Swiss-Prot record:
Name used for this protein in its record: tRNA (guanine-N(1)-)-methyltransferase
Organism: Tolumonas auensis (strain DSM 9187 / NBRC 110442 / TA 4)
GO cellular component: cytosol
EC number: 2.1.1.228
Function: Specifically methylates guanosine-37 in various tRNAs.
Name of encoding gene: trmD
Subcellular locations according to the entry: Cytoplasm
Similarity field: Belongs to the RNA methyltransferase TrmD family.
Length: 249
């Protein structure tokens, strides 16, 4: 199985390529793991890989150009029939059935984010699927990517001595995150939502909360079952659903 990894810290993956079941699979040629560091694609002398988010707020996002160039380089190396995965708390929760689904792929590219995440337009244009390893926060996507590699590799023929072993293997406010955007303002004809450029912090707060509620309702509705929505949250979620229905008509 061919796996490409997009990471600012590729050396972290020695934990799985040098040890254990996955390490043996690499040595035997059953796993071919390759790396692309966005920092190698930065154009300035400081090799900058982060940028400020539109709309303000704490933290930074991964800079669009180095990240996108790294993904494109990995795609070119992979050739046809490669699936690009972004490890993200906003993704589908990784379960064994999901692992089995991904193990059927001959080639995967895993994008390990850092900082507060990546530009939403990169997710829309360059990412095929988002997967999450759980409802908690990590410092980056490297550990989730390693988790996915480890889980998927167990289903690659020959990695385990006995396939029966594999067959027998047994959020801060409770909402998914809202979409994020950084420079450029227009990417492939898709522009940053006007509200994030308005400078009105209250409008931005309400937009982000509404998007967070709506995304949770669409992707992980069971999370809402455990929440007692405030009047504001209930109203914003109703607006999101109404707007979505209007768009689909």
């Amino acid at each position: 199985m061919w796996i490409g990894v997009i990471s600012l810290f590729p050396d972290m993956f020695r934990a799985i390529t040098d040890f254990g079941v996955t390490g043996r699979a690499v040595k035997r040629g059953l796993l071919d793991i390759n790396y692309w560091n966005p920092r190698d694609f930065a154009h300035d002398k400081h090799r900058t890989v982060d940028d400020r988010p539109y709309g303000g707020g704490p933290g930074m996002l991964m800079m669009v150009q180095p990240l996108r160039d790294a993904i494109q380089a990995a795609k070119q190396a992979a050739g046809d029939d490669v699936k690009v995965i972004y490890l993200s708390p906003q993704g589908k929760k990784l379960t064994q059935s999901g692992v089995t689904e991904l193990a059927r792929c001959k080639k995967l590219i895993l994008v390990a984010g850092r900082y507060e995440g990546i530009d939403e337009r990169i997710i829309q244009s360059d990412i095929d699927e988002e997967w999450s390893v759980g409802d908690y926060v990590l410092s980056g996507g490297e550990l989730p990517a390693m988790t996915l590699v480890d889980a998927v590799s167990r289903l690659v023929p020959g990695v385990l001595g006995d396939m029966a072993s594999a067959e027998q293997d047994s959020f801060t406010d409770g909402l998914l995150d809202c979409p994020h955007y950084t420079r450029p303002e227009s990417l492939d004809g898709v522009v940053v939502p006007d509200v994030l450029l308005s400078g009105n912090h209250e409008y931005i707060r309400r937009w982000r909360l509404k998007q967070s509620l709506g995304r949770t309702w669409q992707r992980r509705p069971e999370l809402l079952d455990n929440l007692a929505l405030t009047d504001e949250q209930a109203k914003l979620l109703a607006q999101y659903v109404q707007e979505l229905n209007a768009e689909q008509q």
